Amino acid sequence: MSRAVLSLGSNIGDRAANLRGAVATLRAAGARVVAVSPVYATAPWGGVEQDDFLNAVVVVEDPNSRPRDWLARARAAESRAGRTRDVRWGPRTLDVDVLDVDGTTSDDPELTLPHPRAAERAFVLVPWLDVDPEARIAGHGRVADLLAALPAAERDGVRPDPTALVSR
């Protein structure tokens, strides 16, 4: 069974609908959605002036998927949401990052695993911890420890949002 952890983010248009659409696209592509984190609002990362993001993390499984298959699914979800890649770290309808696949490590420039910046981004670590309190990032350590090591201002910048991505 291939298990992937994916980060979702949106700051253009109906942000909540974009995140929900990503979950629906993953399901339609045959992935079993194991867990969906609460949604968080966060300031943009990377220095480009833009609106705040809504962020979440999903854990998905598929017995027949390899790491590149998860990347293809992530890009398909982005495409379905109208994602364009005009400005690095710029505004986007949907961003889906493959954070981890079965603890695999890879230096492939097309898909580096674990995601090279996951360990330093509170907007990834907070929701990841929600769906897997024992999560580890290969080569970095426990998600809980990585989050605790970040500056308080960064952790505090990840604000709970009332948006629900799945029915409870």
Please tell me what each predicted stretch does.
Residues 21, 25-65:
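Short, surface-exposed acidic-centric catalytic microdomains
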